[in-house]
């Protein structure tokens, strides 16, 4: 039985026991991998590159939808919700790392196996596959819709018939020439430098959003005609709302959960970290989440204060409408699109690992299988990006169904199952709160989204 599960160092049924203070301190500094195994590996990825990789896993197209979320929750409501989700995301990573140290497993899927046997492993692997496919397709959807417009702004005259202004053609070329080769790399640490480039692109985007807040007047002066109606701003539209609730608010928590989900990449990054320990990886996580929170909040706040109620579900569309030929805006569009693009290969790693563990866990590594799984995933996400019309559908449904499981429900549930601590202990109470919060958020948000679709 032990051989069929892979490299377990303990039997199923082992539990996280109540720890003495000195044992807890030793756990914080203990490595996930044995010293012998770690010596056989490369020296590892530095702390900084690990932070960049994790931030790249966290940040993606979600940054474009948060200003829209802020407009539908209010400044104070958004701030509270975003901070709450960020803290809960960090705590759920803490639970995952604790369980991995104690059970001596190195993957999210194996935690599911350790807690609930083979069904647990299959559920976790299936959830990871669905979530990561949804995430990657949403990133490619951004590229398909925005890249042709970004290129067209640099051109004069009518070039509408040319291939480089066709979103589907560009999408296929990019996936074949960039995404697929990067996704084929054998180790996630190789993407550290591209992840650092993506981080600086995101910082540049946030800086431009701040600066351009004073370039677009409010009330908006543009007379924009669409479907026979004139759209304009009035003075009341230029007052920020501190609290706001509407049907569109149903997308708030799912979008935020989607924007902070990095849990499928935690253990792959941990296993390649230089001098890996629970405390060191938790510091990587806290740093990445804090920096992501800062960039998210700044870009969402100033994006909202630029357009107020007229903010688009994809923030870049607003700048295309009102600053269509601004050189800085045109440049930042290309930067943010490139940053989103560089996230896709990183998300390939946990998705491919989940497929491998679900169907080929007892087989040795094969480059042919590695190639074919990567190719299949690439084809699937391209097809989804072509046929899913609204990015909010991806954000809402994926966030409500799978992201909440991976970020809230599974860590809390697994810890409650494996731990033999007293239920009133702080860790177990925290795991219980995490579980209940995830169930409520997922079900409530999904119900509201379906209700909104029916009304439309």
Curated annotation (Swiss-Prot):
Tell where it localizes.
Answer: Cell membrane; Synapse
Entry's Gene Ontology cellular component terms: plasma membrane; synapse
Signal peptide (residue range): none
Sugar-modified residues: 233, 283
Q: Which UniProt keywords apply?
A: Acetylation, Amino-acid transport, Cell membrane, Disulfide bond, Glycoprotein, Membrane, Phosphoprotein, Synapse, Transmembrane, Transmembrane helix, Transport
The UniProt gene name for this protein comes to SLC38A6
Which residue positions does N-acetylmethionine occur at? Answer: 1
Q: Which organism's genome codes for this protein?
A: Homo sapiens
Q: Which GO terms describe its biological process?
A: amino acid transmembrane transport; glutamine transport
Could you list the residue ranges that cross the membrane? Answer: 42-62, 85-105, 111-131, 170-190, 191-211, 250-270, 288-308, 327-347, 371-391, 394-414, 431-451
Keyword rRNA processing recorded: no
How this chain sits in the membrane, per its record, is:
Multi-pass membrane protein
Disulfide bonds listed in the record = 218-238
Tell me which stretches of the chain form a coiled coil: none
One MF term in the entry's GO annotations: L-glutamate transmembrane transporter activity
Q: What is this protein called?
A: Solute carrier family 38 member 6
Main location (coarse class)? membrane
Q: Where Phosphoserine occurs along the chain?
A: 4, 7
Describe the family membership recorded for this protein in Swiss-Prot or TrEMBL: Belongs to the amino acid/polyamine transporter 2 family.
Query: What reaction gets catalysed by this protein?
Result: L-glutamine(out) = L-glutamine(in); L-glutamate(out) = L-glutamate(in)
InterPro entries, alphabetized: AA_transpt_TM
Kindly list the organism's lineage. Answer: Eukaryota, Metazoa, Chordata, Craniata, Vertebrata
What this protein is reported to do is described as: Amino acid transporter with an apparent selectivity for L-glutamine and L-glutamate. May facilitate glutamine uptake in excitatory neurons. The transport mechanism remains to be elucidated.
């Amino acid at each position: 039985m032990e051989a069929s599960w892979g490299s377990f160092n303990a039997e199923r049924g082992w539990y996280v026991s109540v720890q003495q203070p000195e044992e807890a301190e030793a756990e914080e500094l203990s490595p996930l991998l044995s010293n012998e195994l770690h010596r056989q590996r490369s020296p590892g990825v530095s702390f900084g590159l690990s932070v960049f990789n994790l931030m790249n896993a966290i940040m993606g197209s979600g940054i474009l939808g948060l200003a829209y979320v802020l407009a539908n929750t209010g400044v104070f409501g958004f701030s509270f919700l975003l901070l709450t989700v960020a803290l809960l995301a960090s705590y759920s990573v803490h639970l995952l790392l604790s369980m991995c140290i104690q059970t001596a497993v190195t993957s999210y899927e194996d935690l599911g196996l350790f807690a609930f046997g083979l069904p647990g492993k299959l559920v976790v692997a299936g959830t990871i596959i669905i979530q990561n496919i949804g995430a990657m397709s949403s990133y490619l959807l951004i590229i398909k819709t925005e890249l042709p417009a970004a290129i067209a702004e640099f051109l004069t005259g009518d070039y509408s018939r040319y291939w480089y202004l066709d979103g589907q053609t560009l999408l296929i070329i990019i996936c074949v020439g960039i995404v697929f080769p990067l996704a084929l790399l054998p180790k996630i640490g190789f993407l550290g430098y591209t992840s650092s480039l993506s981080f600086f692109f995101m910082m540049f985007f946030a800086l431009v959003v701040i600066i351009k807040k004073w370039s677009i007047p409010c009330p908006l002066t543009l007379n924009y005609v669409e479907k026979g109606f004139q759209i304009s701003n009035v003075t009341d539209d230029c007052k920020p709302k501190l609290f706001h609730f509407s049907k569109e608010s149903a997308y708030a928590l799912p979008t935020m959960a989607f924007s902070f989900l990095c849990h499928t990449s935690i253990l792959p990054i941990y296993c390649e970290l230089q001098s890996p320990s629970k405390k060191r990886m938790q510091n990587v996580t806290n740093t990445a989440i804090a920096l992501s929170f800062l960039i998210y909040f700044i870009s969402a706040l100033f994006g909202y204060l630029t357009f107020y109620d007229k903010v688009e579900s994809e923030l870049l569309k607003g700048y295309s409408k009102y600053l269509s030929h601004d050189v800085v805006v045109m440049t930042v569009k290309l930067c943010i699109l490139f940053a989103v693009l560089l996230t896709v290969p990183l998300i390939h790693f946990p998705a491919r690992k989940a497929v491998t563990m679900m169907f080929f866990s007892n087989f040795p590594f094969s480059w042919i299988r590695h190639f074919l799984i990567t190719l299949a995933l690439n084809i699937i996400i391209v097809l989804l990006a072509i046929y899913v019309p609204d990015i909010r559908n991806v954000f809402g449904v994926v966030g409500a169904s799978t992201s909440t499981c991976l970020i809230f429900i599974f860590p809390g549930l697994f810890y409650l199952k494996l731990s033999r601590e007293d239920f009133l202990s702080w860790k177990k109470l925290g795991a219980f709160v995490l579980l209940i919060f995830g169930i409520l958020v997922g079900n409530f948000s999904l119900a509201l989204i379906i209700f909104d679709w029916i009304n439309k």
